[in-house]
């Protein structure tokens, strides 16, 4: 994606299932911390606004700290939190090396030397990236079983409803943030479960110390989660640690946010991305499991691991298709093939745009995340070229000689590395005209590969959201190479609707596809439809989310995809461009063909998997119409 879109965060959980001495003898000191560092670093694409790490120790004495948390919002947050986590151990290695080798001493005296870890990578889609907003969060209590550490990759659409419920119970939340509300929600049912067990064991005549031990053994995590998550509307992977050593990770019933896990006799590990687990622990693809929608993996203090159905899975899961197009790392085996398929499937539209003239066409990609889709497009170009060679040979079979064959076999896709982002370039100028000129130089281009006024130039991008980078930078700088025509190919379909499940795309007016549809309505004398959609949206503003209809679909209904793409081309083409320009998109059908198991396509279709989605798009349109630049949730 040539435009930066902040999106869902990343989680990493590690539970050591054997005594700490086992890992020291087999792997050496700090093995768990090193694994956590790798597990988070291999997911750093999921969060660069901040990072946090929590650790729970099991066998501490009263008065000893058993939960350690560190966070950083610096420019290198992962390195910072692990520098802090390793600090005690490195100091010991310098000053008291014998203690650095004493695992029992370390557990009782050094931080981050326990059995249970939870890491978080933050991309802030809402709120500031101050330390107080970074995960993991801690709900403290003097009872071990009431301490709750929480981190998640999530966004809930009905935080306002949950807040009202807490207030009705007599609580006074000091924050309205979704994480604070969720922490309190789970914490409330954790408290209730502890109180229920306490009364039960008290009636049996047990001492308070005995009761604490029994509660730790018999805490019903399934009941806590099912009660807490009953009314949640949104996409989430919620990870939690309880002070005595239980842990859980819960995935939403639509499977919107991704989650994978791996267990053996030494460890249990959970992460947002499968390749991170495979690389960190050197395990094969077949052994890393996907946490199914609505399920929770629960790891008890005694090492028992179970996967429980907490919420009824949706009959039509809506796993996020944007994960496959852009957000997740392309090193995942399935995602790699899906991105290649997207590149192949857009090829017919690209060929049509260049009038099938591959001899006089250079193909490339921008940015680097589009490289896999480019491979697929290039393969499809090669297939087309081979078909043309076969036709030429058959057409000239009675008149073939060496020269003719050489001529035929010279037809092949011309792949070149055309654009590279200059990551060191910063824009300090504030005047719009001068700043736009500087932005146009964010990308460097390779000269001498495009024949001026002869060649077409095709570049593929993962997706096009706002179109501002295209207009201000990419089209301008590609035009300097002198192509006859510039074709921008998006491997994703047109992004038409806001997200509300963890991606920072909540304002309709930001979307180039929406602006194109609005422009077409006005040009075609149909501006009244905009007013009508506003009236309908405003009329249902205060209805329950379950009753709200997505009327924004009516904005797009009068036009074909090609008409909207044509208007997008006009909107992203700057003045004084010499080359003819065209923007082409993949279709919804192609998306589903390439990504058959991740059918969450609300960005493109407006078909939201939860009622809260319709509420958000309704609010987004009202905000747009009224000139309100606020987020829709």
Q: What would you call each of these model-derived segments?
A:
Residues 231-234, 338-359, 377-380, 430-453, ...:
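Phosphate/ATP-binding catalytic cores across multiple sugar-kinase/actin-like superfamilies
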């Amino acid at each position: 994606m040539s435009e930066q879109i902040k999106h869902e965060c990343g989680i990493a959980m590690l539970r050591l299932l054997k005594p700490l001495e086992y890992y020291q003898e087999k792997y050496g000191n700090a093995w768990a911390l090193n694994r956590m560092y790798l597990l988070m670093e291999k997911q750093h694409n999921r969060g660069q606004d901040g990072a946090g790490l929590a650790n729970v120790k099991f066998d501490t004495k009263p008065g000893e700290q058993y939960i350690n948390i560190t966070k950083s919002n610096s420019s290198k947050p992962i390195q910072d939190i692990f520098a802090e986590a390793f600090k005690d151990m490195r100091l010991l290695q310098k000053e008291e090396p014998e203690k650095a080798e004493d695992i029992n001493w370390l557990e009782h005296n050094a931080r981050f030397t326990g059995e249970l870890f939870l890491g978080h990578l933050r991309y802030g889609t809402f709120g500031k990236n101050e330390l107080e907003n970074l995960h993991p969060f801690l709900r403290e209590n003097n009872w071990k079983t009431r301490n709750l550490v929480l981190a998640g990759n999530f966004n809930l659409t009905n935080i306002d409803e949950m807040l009202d419920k807490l207030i009705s119970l007599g609580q006074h939340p000091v924050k309205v943030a979704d994480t604070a509300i969720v922490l309190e929600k789970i914490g409330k049912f954790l408290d209730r479960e502890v109180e229920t067990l306490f009364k039960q064991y008290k009636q049996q005549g047990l001492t308070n110390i005995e009761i604490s031990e029994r509660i730790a053994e018999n805490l019903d995590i399934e009941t806590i989660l099912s009660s807490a998550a009953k009314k949640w509307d949104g996409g989430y992977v919620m990870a939690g640690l309880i002070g005595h050593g239980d842990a859980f990770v819960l995935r939403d019933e639509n499977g919107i946010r991704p989650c994978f896990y791996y267990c053996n006799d030494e460890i249990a590990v959970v992460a947002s991305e499968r390749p991170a687990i495979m690389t960190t622990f050197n395990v094969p693809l077949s052994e890393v499991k996907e946490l199914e929608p609505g399920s929770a993996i629960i790891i008890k203090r005694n090492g028992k691991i179970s996967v429980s159905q907490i919420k009824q899975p949706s009959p039509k899961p809506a796993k996020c298709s944007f994960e496959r197009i852009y957000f997740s790392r392309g090193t995942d085996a399935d995602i790699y093939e899906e991105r290649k398929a997207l590149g192949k499937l857009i090829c017919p539209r690209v060929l049509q745009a260049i009038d099938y003239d591959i001899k006089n066409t250079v193909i490339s990609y921008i940015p680097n995340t589009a490289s896999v889709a480019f491979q697929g497009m290039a393969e499809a170009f090669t297939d087309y070229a081979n078909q043309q060679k076969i036709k030429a040979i058959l057409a000239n079979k009675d008149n073939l000689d060496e020269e003719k064959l050489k001529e035929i076999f010279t037809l092949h896709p011309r792949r070149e590395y055309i654009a590279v982002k200059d990551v060191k370039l910063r824009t300090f100028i504030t005047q719009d005209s001068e700043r736009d000129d500087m932005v146009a130089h964010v990308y460097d281009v390779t000269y001498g590969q495009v024949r001026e006024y002869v060649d077409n130039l095709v570049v593929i991008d993962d997706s096009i959201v706002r179109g501002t980078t295209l207009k201000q930078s990419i089209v301008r700088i590609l035009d300097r190479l002198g192509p006859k025509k510039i074709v921008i190919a998006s491997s994703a379909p047109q992004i038409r609707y806001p997200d509300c499940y963890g991606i920072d795309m909540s304002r309709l007016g930001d979307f180039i596809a929406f602006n194109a549809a609005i422009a077409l309505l006005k040009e075609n004398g149909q501006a009244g439809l905009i007013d009508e959609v506003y009236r309908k949206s405003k009329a249902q503003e205060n209805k329950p989310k379950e009753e709200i209809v997505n009327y924004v679909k009516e904005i797009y209904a009068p036009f074909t995809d090609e008409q909207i793409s044509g208007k997008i081309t006009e909107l992203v083409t700057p003045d004084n461009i010499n080359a003819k320009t065209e923007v082409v998109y993949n279709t919804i059908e192609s998306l589903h063909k390439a990504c058959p198991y991740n059918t969450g396509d609300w960005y493109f279709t407006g078909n939201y998997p939860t009622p809260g989605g319709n509420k958000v798009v309704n609010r987004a349109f009202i905000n747009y119409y009224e000139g309100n630049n606020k987020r829709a949730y």
